[in-house]
A protein has these predicted regions:
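Active-site rim segments in enzyme catalytic domains, especially the processed small/beta chain
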Residues: 114-116, 254-317
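Noncatalytic scaffold domains of N-terminal-nucleophile
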Residues: 1-91, 95-144, 148, 208, ...
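Short, well-ordered loop/turn and helix-capping segments at boundaries between secondary-structure elements
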Residues: 12-18, 30, 34, 106, ...
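Internal maturation/activation junctions in enzymes
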Residues: 163-262, 275
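Extended, domain-scale alpha-helical bundle/helix-rich regions
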Residues: 149-155, 185
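Short loop/turn motifs at secondary-structure junctions and domain boundaries
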Residues: 53, 123-124, 236-241, 312
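Short, small/polar residue-rich loop motifs at catalytic or cofactor-binding pockets
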Residues: 127, 240-243, 265, 316
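Glycine-rich phosphate/pyrophosphate-binding beta-alpha loops
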Residues: 141-150, 243-247, 259-271
């Protein structure tokens, strides 16, 4: 998908930031140019990201002698430093126009990609109103569509509000059962009804209404979980390496909560030559099984089908 991180972060900086962009980015430029010491975690993350090894440019950066860069070695990123310098000096145009954009377009053309110069030039971020519910006297707000995580979370809270959780031990099997059933219903709301609101009329108010939650809560049984026939066989699932989150509070009390992702760890694994930029793999978040009547997952959601200019549904909140 068209990279949106640079535009979004710079838009936030323009609206809310105090420091000059050059000052904000200089430490990052220095770090990319001078290098970082490869940690145990970074070494293992590279080794577990099969997609990195498939891309010639990524192999040059992240591998030595066909093995992940060694723990304790110095990893320098001169191309990435140049890209950050362009952004530092030219802002959004330093990424979405000029030599960086040309290299992205050239790489897309050489490898059968879909992003062209028009996609980059026309990209813009959007500020959207949060969505929220009242949960036991507390106002809870989160991100709305095209992010789907907020719908999941708020639906689950609404469902749980119909149960007196204080009656049960917090670590009891019944508590976990109710949490699981509430989240399942939240995922059901997300998977079938969420997409880019500029292209699809997402029934957000209805999805997170108390009336909808009451209906969803009615068929939760205290005695049993879902039928065994509807439960997939066990697959060992490790903690996801997909996404990064950070929260920052400054001396004036201003708070930033940022969840950021390339999709998978290291995204698509494809590095644009000469820029150090890793491309995301967010196209997988579209409904790539749209029209498949046997699918009940978000992969077939009518609200999230492929359309030009559309933003894919995000699972984050």
């Amino acid at each position: 998908a068209v990279p949106g991180t640079v535009y979004g972060l710079l838009e936030a900086h323009e609206r809310f930031g105090d420091l000059p962009l050059e000052k904000v980015l200089q430490p990052v430029i220095d770090q990319a140019r001078n290098g970082i010491i490869v940690s145990y975690d970074l070494h293992n993350a590279i080794g577990s990201s099969y997609q990195l090894k498939k891309d010639p440019e990524s192999r040059k950066i992240y591998f030595q002698n066909n093995k992940p860069v060694a723990i304790g070695s110095l990893m320098k990123r001169p191309d990435l430093a140049k890209t950050f310098e362009a952004i530092s000096k030219e802002g959004k145009d330093g990424f979405y126009d000029g030599w960086v954009a040309e290299k992205i377009q050239s790489s897309m053309k050489d490898n059968g990609g879909f992003i062209d110069s028009n996609d980059l030039e026309q990209y813009s971020s959007k500020f959207r109103d949060p969505i929220g519910v009242n949960y036991r006297g507390y106002s809870v707000y989160t991100q709305g569509p095209p992010s789907g995580g907020g719908i999941t979370f708020l639906t689950a809270l609404n469902v749980l509000s119909y149960y007196n959780l204080g009656k049960y031990r917090k670590d009891s099997s019944l508590t976990y059962h109710l949490l699981a059933e509430a989240l399942r219903r939240g995922h059901n709301n997300r998977s079938h009804h969420v997409g880019d609101p500029d292209y699809y009329d997402v029934p957000t108010e209805g999805l997170i209404s108390k009336g909808r939650a009451k209906l969803l809560a009615k068929n939760i049984s205290f005695d049993k979980a879902s039928k065994a026939s509807s439960i997939q066989k066990y697959n060992h699932i490790e903690e996801s390496k997909d996404t990064t989150h950070y929260s920052v509070i400054d001396r004036n009390g201003n708070a930033v909560s940022n969840t950021y992702t390339l999709g998978y760890s290291f995204g698509s694994g494809v590095t644009i030559p000469g820029t150090g930029i890793l491309m995301n793999n967010q196209m997988r978040n579209f409904a790539y099984k749209y029209g498949d009547k046997t699918s009940t997952s978000r992969a077939s959601s009518p609200g999230n089908r492929f359309e030009p200019g559309k933003r894919p549904m995000s699972t984050m909140h």
